[in-house]
Amino acid sequence: MNSLTLSITTIGDLLLRKTITNCEEPIKDVELCVPLYQRPYKWTARNAIQLLDDIIDAKNSNKERYRVGTLILHKTKEKEQYDIVDGQQRIITFSLLLTALGENSIGVLKQKIYDNTYNDHNIANNYNALFRRVGLKSEDNDSAVEHQREMEHLKDYIENRCELIVVITTDVSEAFQFFDSQNARGKALYPHDLLKAYHLREMNNISEDETERIVKDWEQVSQRDLADFFGNYLYRIKEWVAGNKANILNEHNIHMFKGVTRLARTPYAQFYKSAYCYADMVNSSAMPFVSGTRNVNAFQLDTPIIAGKPFFEYTKHYYNILKDIQNNNKYEGFYINDNIIVKTLDRHFKKGIGNGITRLMFDTSVLLYVDRFCPETYPTKEDIDLFEQFVIYAFIWAYSLRAQYTNLGWLSAQNYIMGWSEKINTFNMYKLIAKQDTPTSLLSALADKLNPLSNDDIKDGWAQECYEYSGDGETLKNLKDEKDGVYENYLYFFQTNGYYKN
């Protein structure tokens, strides 16, 4: 039966005496553990010194008790240990602070915290910063004696006056509910942090070594990049395919990335789990190599995710495809290579909110096309030709929006994407892609839907500055200007592809 314990304990009892006090019956032999699903230790020296200064202020203000936060623990049945669900950053920082004050037997710092550049750097850096403030002075004078006396009083205050609220549960799901609630009231974590924790809990049938490898792979990617990837790309694609406006990914809508759990038994769930298992089985075998066939794609952007390990594979799969799409290097990647349109966009149209929105529309539509129609391996010439034609259509669709605004913001962009705008070429590209069974049917539909722009339609100030009307007012004199083979005006590609009319 699941149990829940609420208590208050001092830092000294918890970290030095391994005891949680101030509850019906003190809990002894509390072995704190930082589980694999935890984020790296990311507090910087500034955070650590700020905590120290707050404690000193509380002590100097004669506060009898100083509440320093909440610690959420999951008591595991298998190892009789207490996994830190929330509060890791403070616990490690307090451990470093007490070590700098002379304690050398703090269990949290003795356990293996998996190898990570953040852990290695921040733990060492923060300890050094704290030691410079509170460590024993080498000089033998009155000032050093006074400093030592003050630090002994500070150490006593930290151990016996600084308190934590402790929540202990034997139900890991309940622990994470408290965790979500805490972060909803305080500084929220990135949604992908919550998803990481959720899917790691679904991996109880995976070995510890494999779990550690998955976590390391995840943490190798910049957390800011992951936040951008989920919030601006995966989330928006899912909403737009469904015909919804895409606002902000947060804790209230991350359910769309939780997916089908291992315990789900409905026909709907079994269908998607079976499809994943089949793809995994084929790709893990020698069949693709021996037969020369293509790998089977285990994922689709507009279908449910399988919870657990597949979620991390899904993330890596689409993150790599997106980086490939965004990298126009001639000799790297499979999809966009040395594309003349993308060269112009990369060189001249990356700065500014409007250009950023438009490029995101271009990238996400290409990502959805690749996901639906491009083979992962062994593309044919027909595959490549169809893809390159789609890139032109995706560019015309996205940059028709940019050309029709002097200042473009998200409200106008969302209306354009939904097909609610009065601007030329407003329609939901994502729904259109998702409805097509073949790339040829998609390209035919786009050929019917896309219309050319006229001089009167073009409002983009930067684009207008790049050309001058000739004497008869019918042609653009310097639309063809280029440097090092890169055209300066994206409207040139409207003209050469028949989507600009005088």
Predicted features, each with a name:
Residues 1-502:
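Flexible coil/loop and intrinsically disordered segments
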